Amino acid sequence: MTGYILAIDQGTTSSRAVIFDGAMKIVAVGQKEFPQHYPASGWVEHDPEDIWKSVVATVKTALRKAKLEASRITAIGITNQRETAVIWDRATGMPIHNAIVWQDRRTAPLCAKLKKAGLEPKFTRKTGLLLDPYFSGTKFAWLLDNVKGARRRAEKGELLAGTIDTYLIWRLTGGRMHATDATNASRTLLYNISKNAWDADLLKILRIPTALLPEVKDCAAEFGVTEKKIFGAEIPILGVAGDQQAATIGQACFEPGMLKSTYGTGCFAVLNTGERLIRSKNRLLSTIAYRLDGKTTYALEGSIFIAGAAVQWLRDGIKVIGKAAESGALAERSDETQQIYLVPAFVGLGAPHWDADARGAIFGLTRNSGPAEFARAALESVAYQTHDLLVAMKRDCGNTFGKTVLRVDGGMVASSWTMQCLADILDAPVDSPTITETTALGAAWLAGSKAGIWPDRATFAKSWALERRFEPQMDGRQRKAKLAGWADAVSRTLTARAPC
């Protein structure tokens, strides 16, 4: 098949542009980091203009590397950091405030207030989500309540809101399209995932005008065309999905029971549950995996806030490594007789605990503990947290989906030590694919299949190829002892207000 597809992968710390050819092979990649802003404890912001400039720069870099004119690009697929919230002026396109990032915890008091009022069951029943600062809805409410004149302007229809995909679509199309897809909408705390519509009751509770929100489309749909002046050609935007759902698609997890986990800044495990919307009883998230041709496929998701960010802490915080890639080799040199546990609750704990007030802690230190032991504890914490997610998934699903095989992607997959540790702690095979750019690949497939130049779902799934399988090697008694120590460490970290 001929033609090129451009995937825009807008992440938490950087933006990437990946160009694929008609055979679904990567031709060129552009990447650019952008600043993070921490105006107060627990607050994390991005300047939307930084995001926009980084996206444009990476696309131009990828086109230059590929030696392609923009007119050779058949379609664009967009994938993005989810939940990050931005509100902008409808007339000028200027944001009224920095974007509030998914990691930001400033709306914890509002979430606590809503919980105290007994409203969490209503939000969960309608959205599949929990009342946590993680999600976009309370961020939108905070912006309307704390930016001078914002609520009045929103009610007059002068403002627009969205997650990062929506903001990029608006900018790319020159303000002609205010839209999102079902996966991003499902992460806002405002979208009824059973009815596939914005929920009037929830909007009323958070006092968010319906007109502020974007139109919700299928993941493979027409999201407008780019302004010619941006890249030199008008390019259709034909695919959009939140980053974890895009990775689920890129990993070809199309059948119920298939499971992937992405290891980037955080860790996100997604289990395809098919047309069945499973209501979690173990504080996982019920969400939309994707919506194609008007048909919704659901998923259970477990979200961990700190995964690769723990390695960044080793590098930037306590400076025991110079580069993230050094962490695995350093951990391999650790003293295995020491059992150190790092509970990386730097911004609270995500699933299945959902404790916004928990903070990080290290247990088991001795005088002989050093950089190698810290590195091992940081990497093992990723495996332990993933184990907690999979236990919760099994409790929700029973034996419906059979034996676990975990497909993995993200930057941490490059560490063989970490992936072997993951297989050992999970007592399950861990599969790494040949194409590691699974998030970009998922967005590209949405656009390419919609454009008619990439294969259908079944054929695409057959193209998934295994690079390496990590089989569990740890003795069962050792695994049990390690997990018991982890459970004890977590219990000591949780606050009195934690739900479990």
Curated annotation (Swiss-Prot):
Residues that, per the record, bind sn-glycerol 3-phosphate: T12, R82, E83, Y134, D243
N-terminal signal peptide: none
GO cellular component, one term: cytosol
EC nos: 2.7.1.30
Organism of this sequence: Chelativorans sp. (strain BNC1)
Residue positions binding ATP: T12, T13, S14, T265, G308, Q312, G411
Function recorded in the entry: Key enzyme in the regulation of glycerol uptake and metabolism. Catalyzes the phosphorylation of glycerol to yield sn-glycerol 3-phosphate.
Gene from which this protein is expressed: glpK
Binding positions for ADP per the UniProt entry: T12, R16, T265, G308, G411
Pathway terms, separated by semicolons: Polyol metabolism; glycerol degradation via glycerol kinase pathway; sn-glycerol 3-phosphate from glycerol: step 1/1
Keyword ATP-binding: yes
NCBIfam families membership: glycerol_kin, PRK00047.1
Family under the similarity heading: Belongs to the FGGY kinase family.
Protein name: Glycerol kinase
Keywords: ATP-binding, Glycerol metabolism, Kinase, Nucleotide-binding, Transferase
